[in-house]
Amino acid sequence: MRQIFLFIFSSSLLFAGCGSSNSGKSKEVIVFHAGSLSVPMKQVVEEYEKMHPGTKILLESAGSLVCARKITELKKPCDIIASSDYFVINELLIPEYTKWSIRFATNEIVIAGNEKSKYIDELNSESWMDILQKNDVIYARADPNSDPCGYRTIFTLMLAEKFYNKTGLAEKMVSKNQEYIRPKEVDLVALLESNTIDYMFQYKSVAIQHGLKYIELPKEMNLSDPSNNDIYKSVSLDVAGNKPGVKMKVTGDYINYSITVLDEAPQKAEAINFLEFLLGPEGMNIFKINGQEPIIPFSTEEPDLIPSKLLKYLKEPK
């Protein structure tokens, strides 16, 4: 009898333990996102998880092009991808991996430094070209093959060359300090904070989030103004495509961040719920506080394919 009792008792514990483990398991939503979204994304996730204790949002940052290649080349599981350039999702992921994307925020290219940067008191929207070309000044930029901030930096230099009529400016700047190119724009912040570099081309939102000194550039070159889009589209660059050895052409454009849920998302329903919160007033207020301007109403090229929960954000607010 004692043996039978022990067997029944231990079996009961085993099944009780299994039931407890399954019921307590969180839903995990995987988000690949641009490095420049790290700060607002973390804050949005903190708020969402307070309201949904049974859901865990797993954030993984990288350059947007790298985020896309994790899906197309490495076949890594992912629910949501948020890119700093809508072009990345449209060109590399639609239609094979997702059918739609929503453009939800903008930004602008600035030149950022700190109080220890050489000639910081002389830096302005006219002098920056001469200062950054000085032999004793080191500047850094993101990799154009990994991060849209990288090719946008080169676009800004090309547009500055035209705007200021400085023949050869872009080529000189691109060839300078190449050892300080990094995979994503937020990697540049560590170089500045350690005083390894003096300046960097950066998104305004990242400069604000890290309390950096920065100068704004004319709208004809900072990629922030849709009314100047014809000017922006006058420059282009070939960058690494979705397969090794393949190049794709990227054309200058007004900065548009975009986001989507993948067709094969492991937690598609919960991913859409999270996206509903992120794109809602509370989520967008967090972005705005962090210097990331929402584009309201949001836009899409695939209105008929957008999940029904998100359609309300594509209309003009009343």
For each predicted feature, which ranges?
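Positively charged n-region of N-terminal signal peptides that target proteins for export
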Residues: 1-4
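Bacterial N-terminal signal peptides
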Residues: 6-14
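Residues that line or immediately flank small-molecule/substrate-binding pockets and catalytic motifs
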Residues: 8, 85, 204
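Exported/periplasmic ABC-transporter solute-binding proteins
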Residues: 18-52, 56-60, 65, 72, ...
